[in-house]
């Protein structure tokens, strides 16, 4: 019975992740809180973790703490970039960064970059946050995770580290 439950749990996690993966990561150049531009091309050759957030989202706040641990664990092996979407403004982001002791770049997006990552369109404008994208050194999205019940371990537990370890070892799903 535990075996069947385990298979079902794995199947649910796989079905809830990766639907936006396997394609070239859309390029961008976005400003951070201090006005410095961050271009995705500058991170070519290393694993990049992008999370799309809103500072008022409780799951995004929880993820910020997890990403701080990811940055501490992996150092230069993994670049962590957060992208905030409207209605976040400079004051909200400054408060968020200070409140979570964030050292990695938090970038401002007017919505176009996040829409290209999430494949949002006028016909399908739904954007769920947080959403994490894992990008390999060649610029391909290898996996992505939107926050759902069956992906909570990615956002709250060690699941994200396992996915990063898999990608660093060259064993990504796509």
Predicted regions and their residues:
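Thiol-/selenol-based redox modules, centered on thioredoxin-like
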Residues: 129-174
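Sec-dependent N-terminal signal peptides
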Residues: 3-12
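Short, internal strand/loop/helix patches
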Residues: 96-131, 135-137
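Conserved redox-active cysteine motifs that mediate thiol-disulfide chemistry
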Residues: 44, 52-69
């Amino acid at each position: 019975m535990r075996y069947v439950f385990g298979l079902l749990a794995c199947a649910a996690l796989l079905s809830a992740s990766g639907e936006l993966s396997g394609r070239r990561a859309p390029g961008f150049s976005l400003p951070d809180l201090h006005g410095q531009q961050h271009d995705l091309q500058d991170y070519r050759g290393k694993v990049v973790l992008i999370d799309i957030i809103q500072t008022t989202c409780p799951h995004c706040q929880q993820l910020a703490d997890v990403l701080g641990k990811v940055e501490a664990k992996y150092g230069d092996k993994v670049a962590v970039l957060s992208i905030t979407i409207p209605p976040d403004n400079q004051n909200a982001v400054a408060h968020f960064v200070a409140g979570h002791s964030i050292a990695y770049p938090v970038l401002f997006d007017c919505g176009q970059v996040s829409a290209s990552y999430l494949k949002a369109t006028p016909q399908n404008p739904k954007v769920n946050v947080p959403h994490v994208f894992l990008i390999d050194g060649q610029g391909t999205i290898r996996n992505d995770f939107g926050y759902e019940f069956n992906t909570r371990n990615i956002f709250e537990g060690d699941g994200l580290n396992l996915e990063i370890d898999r990608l660093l070892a060259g064993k990504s799903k796509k």
